[in-house]
């Protein structure tokens, strides 16, 4: 099972991407539940394709890209290194984002968080319902493919909502530490919800793993 509490740039990226200087291949993480465990909110077909095909493709392409990057480093080929950056960002981001996403979900999820996380949500958004509305709106409003996020601003000590296009990783592009991510690529919902993204957003709140989100939040406060 994936680590459930990841905080800080080096701690966030190192376990997932590794260090290019000491190359180690990435692997597809196991899900902490069965493909059908999130039904009826997210069906088994979506989960199987999403995990075993889409996430697996990001992992495989990341490994290939890192091998090419290592070769470019060894040759001192700066042009090739620069040319590989988009693929590193896209596939590395896809691996990071999905590795968080799977642990953010649970068949025993839904409801509201408790304790310090709930108090922080009320402090920063007014109420839990207002927070849900804002994150839902940010996620629905993503043009094309991307992610809606609840992140932690370490400098300010506050929670923030953000949206990232494509597979841009939250921390690597905004500096916010990811706590909860909602995948709004069509492959995450189209087979069940067709083009009605708001229905998918309404359903996913029933399987949010608030224990995992809370663990991430508490780790980032240390």
Swiss-Prot record:
Nitrated under oxidative stress. Nitration coupled with oxidation inhibits the catalytic activity. Acetylation at Lys-122 decreases enzymatic activity. Deacetylated by SIRT3 upon exposure to ionizing radiations or after long fasting. One of its GO terms (cellular component) is mitochondrion. The keyword Nucleotidyltransferase does not apply. The modification 3'-nitrotyrosine is found at residue 58. The modification N6-succinyllysine is found at residues 68, 75, 122, 130. It is found in: Mitochondrion matrix. Mn(2+) binds at residues 50, 98, 183, 187. Binds 1 Mn(2+) ion per subunit. Induction: Expression is regulated by KRIT1. It catalyses: 2 superoxide + 2 H(+) = H2O2 + O2. Its main location: mitochondrion. Its cofactor is Mn(2+). One of its GO terms (molecular function) is enzyme binding. Homotetramer. It is linked to Microvascular complications of diabetes 6: Pathological conditions that develop in numerous tissues and organs as a consequence of diabetes mellitus. They include diabetic retinopathy, diabetic nephropathy leading to end-stage renal disease, and diabetic neuropathy. Diabetic retinopathy remains the major cause of new-onset blindness among diabetic adults. It is characterized by vascular permeability and increased tissue ischemia and angiogenesis. Belongs to the iron/manganese superoxide dismutase family. Destroys superoxide anion radicals which are normally produced within the cells and which are toxic to biological systems. This is Superoxide dismutase [Mn], mitochondrial. The lineage of its organism: Eukaryota, Metazoa, Chordata, Craniata, Vertebrata.
């Amino acid at each position: 099972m994936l680590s459930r509490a990841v905080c800080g740039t080096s701690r966030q990226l190192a376990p997932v991407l590794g260090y290019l200087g000491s190359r180690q291949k990435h692997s597809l993480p196991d899900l902490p539940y069965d493909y059908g465990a999130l039904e009826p909110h997210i069906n088994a077909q979506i989960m199987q394709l999403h995990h075993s095909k889409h996430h697996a493709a990001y992992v495989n392409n990341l490994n290939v890209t890192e091998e090419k990057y290592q070769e470019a480093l060894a040759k001192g080929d700066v042009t090739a290194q620069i040319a590989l950056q988009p693929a590193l960002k896209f596939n590395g981001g896809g691996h990071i984002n999905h590795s968080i996403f799977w642990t953010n979900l649970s068949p025993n999820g839904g409801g509201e968080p408790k304790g310090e996380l709930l108090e922080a949500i009320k402090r920063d958004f007014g109420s839990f319902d207002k927070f849900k509305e804002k994150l839902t709106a940010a996620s629905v409003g993503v043009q094309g493919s991307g992610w809606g996020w609840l992140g932690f601003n370490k400098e300010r000590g506050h929670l923030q909502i953000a949206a990232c296009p494509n597979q841009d990783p939250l921390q690597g592009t905004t500096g916010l530490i990811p706590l909860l991510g909602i995948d709004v690529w069509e492959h995450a919902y189209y087979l069940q919800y067709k083009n009605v993204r708001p229905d998918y957003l309404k359903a996913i709140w029933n399987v949010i793993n608030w224990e995992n989100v809370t663990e991430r939040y508490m780790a980032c406060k240390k």
